[in-house]
Structures are given as structure tokens and as C-alpha cells.
Amino acid sequence: MYDWFSEMRKKDPVYYDGNIWQVFSYRYTKEVLNNFSKFSSDLTGYHERLEDLRNGKIRFDIPTRYTMLTSDPPLHDELRSMSADIFSPQKLQTLETFIRETTRSLLDSIDPREDDIVKKLAVPLPIIVISKILGLPIEDKEKFKEWSDLVAFRLGKPGEIFELGKKYLELIGYVKDHLNSGTEVVSRVVNSNLSDIEKLGYIILLLIAGNETTTNLISNSVIDFTRFNLWQRIREENLYLKAIEEALRYSPPVMRTVRKTKERVKLGDQTIEEGEYVRVWIASANRDEEVFHDGEKFIPDRNPNPHLSFGSGIHLCLGAPLARLEARIAIEEFSKRFRHIEILDTEKVPNEVLNGYKRLVVRLKSNE
């Protein structure tokens, strides 16, 4: 795929494939992400659907349609402001000890002879942390993972659609049951002027949005640092922060995203009509040689590193500071405990949007 990205950046950085516009270069990807006045994140007719729901024209809808990810200003700004402070440096500082202790406990459960570190570390860590932030029972983490996969992948054969619908209703019911027993941020949402479905969507987004991406960031970092034999250098030169940023660039947890044009738009040499869908390839933009010297090469101390893996503009990922903190602590503690990592088996996430591993089986030797 990356060979195709490289070819398209040179030949057709903005390309129409007969169905959807595709963007490959850093310059135009960033332009689409930043220009919310021309490129909308509302891909589902958010406002129209919400109005129909309130008027009773729609009896049931999926709450995750109604979030800051799928809205434009001014509603987007209102939604984002309600939880911005929980990801502030001051708030995250209070979580560092909890994250480190949780990471050490999870590492204790790993069998160094052979074990799956996606299952034992990369999956549970972000779920446990967001559960604490929201005041939800940590013992329900297995349910959170199942629901997270459901919302992230939205996969299913025709015969499985009914079962998927039942699981989605379970998720909605769970969030409803805990709306009045959460922490300050949950109370803030409950007491806001949002509609009931917006409140549900908001809490569901906070609960699961960062799980898959943080899991992918941790597992991708382990893969990249092992593949390029970088663990010793990262330890000795204390390159954890820069190396994780490079893993974000080189192996982004999210490969692409989509916007919809609000008006006729000129992008590069192409003219895109109003109402067209535009797919921007973050994974391609992150290796654009016009921005990243030796973009196809993994450089653990790369600086500067203006990758787009957490987005750009008003939709820059709200939870990015938390994801970075979790990944840094996970990699630090993992690296301190194990000096040799042998990858035995892997299984990729079956999804062209998310980039990560369902399984990452390793053999480890401790530093003792």
C-alpha cells in the first residue's frame, strides 16, 4: 500500500476514482483537515437526522452519529469544550502514578515464555484508565473492549447484523444505567442542554474512542522498535517520547478519514463539487518527502515531526495527550522489564481504517 501512496503523491495527489475523491499529499491532506468551512465532518446529515429524531420521524438511531467527531462549529465547539479540561496537562499529571502502577500490574501478568501483549497490555491499559476518568467499574473492561470493537469496526456478515444490533443496545443500556453515577465530566454531560441521544453519544465516544487507537499505538510501537532493533538505543538515549512520535508517523493508528464538501472547492489542480466525499490518507501524508526527509525510513529521534496521526485543526484529537502518556509509560515500563523481545506470531486488525494488531505474541527475556 505504501508503494501506491508514494506513486500517487507524485502522480495524482488529489485523485477521483469514480466513486470518491482521494488525497495523498501532506499539503492537501492538511488543507482538508483544517478547512472546516469547506470540508465538513458531518457525513451523515447530523443536523437533519437529529431534528427528525426530536420530531419523532426517526424512532431509533445510533448515538455515535451525534458526537464532536461528526459535527461542525458551533455545535462541535460546544461539545468539545465540555470535556477539554479532563485532558489538560494538570489533570493528566494526577493520572501518571495510576497509569504507571496499572502498567506494572499488567506486565506482571505476562508470561515471558510466550504471551500476547495486545491482550495482556495494549488492550486493557487504555480501557482501565478511561474507566477511572469516567468513574465506571473497571471490572467491566471486557465488555468495554467488545463494545469498542463493535463501534470501531462495524463489521458483520448479514446473518450477524441482529447480534450486532443487540450488542449495540447493550452498550446504550449500560451507558444509560451509569449516567448518574459517574465522575464530574459525566455529570457535566448529564446536566447539559444536549438531547438524550447526544448525551449517550458523548459518553460512548469518551468511553471507547481512544481504546482502539491507543491499543494500536502501543502494539505498533512494539512492532516497529523490534523490527528496527531500536530498544537498546531508545533506552540508552531516553528517546521514548520522540520514538513514539515516530511510531505515530510511520505506523499511524488510523490510516485515513473522510470529509464532505460544503461547496464547490478547488484542491490542487482538481475542482470538487459540493456534496462530494473526500478521503484523506493520513498514512500517505505522514511519509510525504516534501515534509519528511527520508519519509520511508523510521528515524527514532526525528525532529521536527509534524505528523497528522492525531488529525489537525479543530478536530485535533482531544485525547491525544492521554494516548501519548499511556503509550510512553507502557513502553518505558515494558522496556525496563524486558531486554530481549522475539515476535512469534501476529494478526492484523481486519480493517482498512484502523492500523494495528489483534494479536502480538512474543517471547521475552527480563532485564534481571
UniProtKB/Swiss-Prot annotation:
Changing residue 213 to V: 147-fold reduction in styrene epoxidation activity. No effect on thermostability. Changing residue 213 to W: 19-fold reduction in styrene epoxidation activity. No effect on thermostability. Its cofactor is heme. Optimum temperature is about 75 degrees Celsius. Activity is 10-fold greater at 75 degrees Celsius than that measured at 25 degrees Celsius. Thermostable up to 85 degrees Celsius. Thermal denaturation midpoint (Tm) is 91 degrees Celsius. GO terms for molecular function: heme binding; iron ion binding; lactoperoxidase activity; monooxygenase activity; oxidoreductase activity, acting on paired donors, with incorporation or reduction of molecular oxygen. The keyword Iron applies. One of its GO terms (cellular component) is cytoplasm. Belongs to the cytochrome P450 family. This is Cytochrome P450 119. It comes from Sulfolobus acidocaldarius (strain ATCC 33909 / DSM 639 / JCM 8929 / NBRC 15157 / NCIMB 11770). The lineage of its organism: Archaea, Thermoproteota, Thermoprotei, Sulfolobales, Sulfolobaceae. The gene is cyp119.
